[in-house]
Amino acid sequence: MEKGEVASLRCRLLLLLLLLTLPPTHQGRTLRHIDPIQSAQDSPAKYLSNGPGQEPVTVLTIDLTKISKPSSSFEFRTWDPEGVIFYGDTNTEDDWFMLGLRDGQLEIQLHNLWARLTVGFGPRLNDGRWHPVELKMNGDSLLLWVDGKEMLCLRQVSASLADHPQLSMRIALGGLLLPTSKLRFPLVPALDGCIRRDIWLGHQAQLSTSARTSLGNCDVDLQPGLFFPPGTHAEFSLQDIPQPHTDPWTFSLELGFKLVDGAGRLLTLGTGTNSSWLTLHLQDQTVVLSSEAEPKLALPLAVGLPLQLKLDVFKVALSQGPKMEVLSTSLLRLASLWRLWSHPQGHLSLGALPGEDSSASFCLSDLWVQGQRLDIDKALSRSQDIWTHSCPQSPSNDTHTSH
């Protein structure tokens, strides 16, 4: 084969991988050729997220000289509108690409010596359904189908790779191998989603014996929401969330519970030295409000109605629908509460405190602070096992332990 033909083939393979979502695996795994039909039916769905941040689920090194089949297919589902499906490169400086979601639509970002582009296309796919995706090479074009419909056609671009001797490529699933800031249009990398029935250029990746076996939320029926398995937590700095009104001083938050189970901490307002100035606990389907030495309040929890917590200069009120419980406290105690917002370690925490034993799990449809929706991706810190955009349809043994 002539040198120019080899370069052209390598260019096509790079563009092919540009549009290809790869199967999630782990480092240390090897590739083997298998029957595609058997692969698609036998392999379990795999979870894409590796927690907050940009760390990928796995990183693969691909030998571009051993690609055996120029077509690929897979199914994926998510309620998450934004995140990385996969990132690939031969080097992070001038030859990388990314396939992900933004506002629920597929997006490709490409950066190399011949092209720098960003393309968003197709319908919104973050509807919780399994969407089949197929990629084929047709003459000089690459075709992409979603749900059996052609969504994208890229014509080949003539570019010589004669001075680009690398024949291997890194593929990172569910994350990035370069800083998020180096993307042409940065996004939140973590994606709460799953892939199944994936065939990759006639091959399928096999998990190593030491690979993490968690399926995340891929083996249960889902609904949209924010799910905290037992023992998980998320922490927001009070300086980073909507601030209290000042005249008069008031602060409110609202939690829309879709399901709750177990017993333990739901919410905390405090600081690093006093981690629980005000706390909401779940016990026997009842929310218990406590504030240090003050008497406790209990409110039976009705799933489906928003739970509201309101603070002002005279009281703390907990309500749900027509039911309300009020905790009257001293001005001295309330003054210390107001100072939480000026304290550098003032925080709002959801779920169990770090290291705390808790069996409570819950799903939130919404989390509002001062009338504004709070984004879990903006948390100061959060547990790896939180499902950021999905919840189980009902409590089950599968969700009583962290993944």
Swiss-Prot record:
Isoform 2 is only expressed in the liver. Its main location: secreted. It comes from the Eukaryota. PROSITE patterns: LAM_G_DOMAIN. Residues 1-30 form the signal peptide. GO terms for biological process: primary spermatocyte growth. The keyword DNA damage does not apply. Disulfide bonds join 194-218, 363-391. GO terms for cellular component: extracellular space. SUPFAM superfamilies: Concanavalin A-like lectins/glucanases (SSF49899). GO terms for molecular function: steroid binding. InterPro entries: ConA-like_dom_sf (IPR013320), GAS-SHBG-PROS (IPR051145), Laminin_G (IPR001791). Keywords: Disulfide bond, Glycoprotein, Lipid-binding, Repeat, Secreted, Signal, Steroid-binding. Residues 46-218, 225-391 form the Laminin G-like domain. The keyword Ribonucleoprotein does not apply. Glycans are attached at residues 274, 397. It is found in: Secreted. Homodimer. Functions as an androgen transport protein, but may also be involved in receptor mediated processes. Each dimer binds one molecule of steroid. Specific for 5-alpha-dihydrotestosterone, testosterone, and 17-beta-estradiol. Regulates the plasma metabolic clearance rate of steroid hormones by controlling their plasma concentration. A putative trans-splicing which involves HDC and SHBG gene regions produces a fusion protein expressed in fetal liver. This is Sex hormone-binding globulin. The gene is Shbg.
